Structures are given as structure tokens and as C-alpha cells.
């Protein structure tokens, strides 16, 4: 067969519609329940689709942002780190509510970080004190601190985690990152908000706190709010899938 025998057949071309295209990004608005400072509505761009579920604005992130707005002293004049930030709503609210500065992190995937950067930098009044950074849980967090301008002995004051504990294989890495980020700061607080999206795995979700306690953290429940389940058609009791739980974790000074 001659070299040009396949000409016109397009054997290396996928036919139109063969592979679904990635959905385009979409914008959503978050209406703040209380507005200590900044706009009443925060605009967020969500990636069109992503294997790490960053294309949703999760109930836990909304409730964490609401908690910060209701309790702005939580972040005022504090150095704040958000892990698994997604669209970055709690980070943005923290910056508006008076945080000294905020580092908003997610898995180091260009699509995720570009979108996070877009969201956290869209408001000129907070752009200078908030940054978006790729970070892999469990890895050395010193580079994140260095990029934030930390001195050698500086650590974060406040950590924000929303809807991360469902990722059971990553619990130990998350706890390791939390400890590194606040090491030596007796006043630091880690806020952990989540929903049992898979009620039959709720006990596995809570193992996160067992690991945290074994690493020296004290645990306190601070919130329980009912919303609408993220996915109505999912299995499991809707009232469980609709509930957001909020905890705070601290490491007390050794006596």
C-alpha cells in the first residue's frame, strides 16, 4: 500500500463527539450571611470539571466562610493557611475579615491553581495579602512559608480545612501538614469542617480525629448546620448528607 493510501481517512483523528469535551468554567455567587467588611456577594469561578471535585462549591466551605464572617476575630490579624482550598471561598472571606495574610493552597495541578489564583486575586483590596500556591499534603511546608515571606521561626496561626476528611488515605498526611504549619504556636487553631457524604463511611471519616488526637491535638466540636445534600440522588440518609460538622483542633502547651 502506498504512503498516501490512508489519505482522507483520518485514522488518527477522533470523530467529532467521540470524546466529550471538558465543560467550561462556571461562575457562582456566594451571598454572605454577615458582612464585617468587603462585598455582600463573592464571585467565584469553578473549574469546568476535575477529578478532585474542585468543580463544586461545597457546603462545608460555605459554612466555614459563614463561621468566619460571624466570628471575624477568628482570623483578624492572623496568618491563615487553607488546605485543599478548591475555589478559595474561606480564604477570600478571611482576607476581607482582616487576616494579616492568607495562603490558599490546593493540589499542585495547573488548572486548579490557575483557577484559585483567578479567584483570590480578583478583588484589588485584598490581592496584596492573599496568594494561591500548589501544595501536596504531607510534603515539607517550609517552601510555602518561605514564599509567604515567613522568617525562620514563624508559623501559621489559623488553618482552614473544609470537606477533606472524606479522603481517608490522606488523613495522616493532612495531620502532618497541620502540625508542620503551626509547630510551636500554642495559640494556633485548626478548623475542620466536613459532611459525611457517604454515611456508610462516616466512621472512617472520623478516624481523622483519632489520628489527630494521637498526634497531640485536642478536639472540640463547634458547629452543626443543616443544608441541602450536595447530591440528592446519592445513597444514604439525606439528613446525614445534608449536615455540616465543624471542629477546632489545638495543641496545648505541655505542662
Curated annotation (Swiss-Prot):
Q: Where does S-adenosyl-L-methionine bind?
A: 58, 84-86, 106, 137, 162
From the UniProt annotation, give the residues forming the signal peptide.
none
Question: What EC identifiers does the entry list?
Answer: 2.1.1.-
GO MF terms on file?
Answer: N-terminal protein N-methyltransferase activity; nicotinamide N-methyltransferase activity; protein methyltransferase activity; protein-lysine N-methyltransferase activity
Tell me which GO cellular component terms the UniProt record holds: cytosol
EC top class, as a word: transferase
Keyword DNA damage listed: no
Supply the alphabetized keyword list: Cytoplasm, Methyltransferase, S-adenosyl-L-methionine, Transferase
Region named Disordered: 1-25
- GO biological process terms on file: methylation; nicotinamide metabolic process
The highest taxon in the source lineage is Eukaryota
InterPro entries under this entry? EFM7 (IPR025784), Methyltransf_16 (IPR019410), SAM-dependent_MTases_sf (IPR029063)
Localization recorded for this chain is: Cytoplasm
UniProt xrefs under PANTHER family: HEPATOCELLULAR CARCINOMA-ASSOCIATED ANTIGEN (PTHR14614), PROTEIN N-TERMINAL AND LYSINE N-METHYLTRANSFERASE EFM7 (PTHR14614:SF10)
Q: Belongs to which family?
A: Belongs to the class I-like SAM-binding methyltransferase superfamily. EFM7 family.
Role this protein plays:
S-adenosyl-L-methionine-dependent protein methyltransferase that trimethylates the N-terminal glycine 'Gly-2' of elongation factor 1-alpha, before also catalyzing the mono- and dimethylation of 'Lys-3'.
| Protein's recorded name | Protein N-terminal and lysine N-methyltransferase efm7
Query: Which organism was this protein described from?
Result: Schizosaccharomyces pombe (strain 972 / ATCC 24843)
Amino acid at each position: 500500500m502506498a504512503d498516501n493510501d490512508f489519505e482522507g481517512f483520518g485514522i488518527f483523528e477522533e470523530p467529532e463527539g467521540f470524546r466529550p469535551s471538558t465543560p467550561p468554567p462556571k461562575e457562582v455567587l456566594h451571598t454572605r450571611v454577615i458582612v464585617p467588611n468587603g462585598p455582600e456577594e463573592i464571585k467565584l469561578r469553578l473549574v469546568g470539571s476535575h477529578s478532585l471535585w474542585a468543580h463544586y462549591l461545597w457546603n462545608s466551605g460555605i459554612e466555614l466562610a459563614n463561621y468566619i464572617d460571624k466570628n471575624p476575630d477568628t482570623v483578624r490579624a492572623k496568618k491563615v493557611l487553607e488546605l485543599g482550598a478548591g475555589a478559595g471561598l474561606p480564604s477570600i472571606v478571611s482576607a476581607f475579615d482582616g487576616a494579616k495574610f492568607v495562603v490558599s493552597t490546593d493540589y499542585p495541578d495547573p488548572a486548579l491553581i490557575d483557577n484559585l489564583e483567578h479567584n483570590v486575586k480578583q478583588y484589588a483590596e485584598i490581592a496584596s495579602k492573599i496568594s494561591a500556591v500548589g501544595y501536596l499534603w504531607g510534603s515539607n511546608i517550609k517552601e510555602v512559608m518561605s514564599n509567604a515571606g515567613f522568617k525562620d521561626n514563624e508559623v501559621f496561626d489559623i488553618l482552614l480545612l473544609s470537606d477533606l476528611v472524606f479522603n481517608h488515605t490522606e488523613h495522616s498526611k493532612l495531620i502532618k501538614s497541620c502540625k508542620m504549619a503551626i509547630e510551636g504556636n500554642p495559640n494556633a487553631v485548626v478548623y475542620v469542617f466536613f459532611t459525611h457524604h457517604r454515611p456508610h463511611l462516616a466512621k472512617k471519616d472520623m478516624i481523622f480525629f483519632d489520628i489527630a488526637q494521637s498526634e497531640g491535638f485536642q478536639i472540640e466540636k463547634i458547629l452543626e448546620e443543616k443544608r441541602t445534600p450536595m447530591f440528592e440522588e446519592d445513597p444514604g440518609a439525606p439528613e446525614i448528607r445534608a449536615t455540616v460538622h465543624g471542629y477546632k483542633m489545638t495543641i496545648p502547651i505541655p505542662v
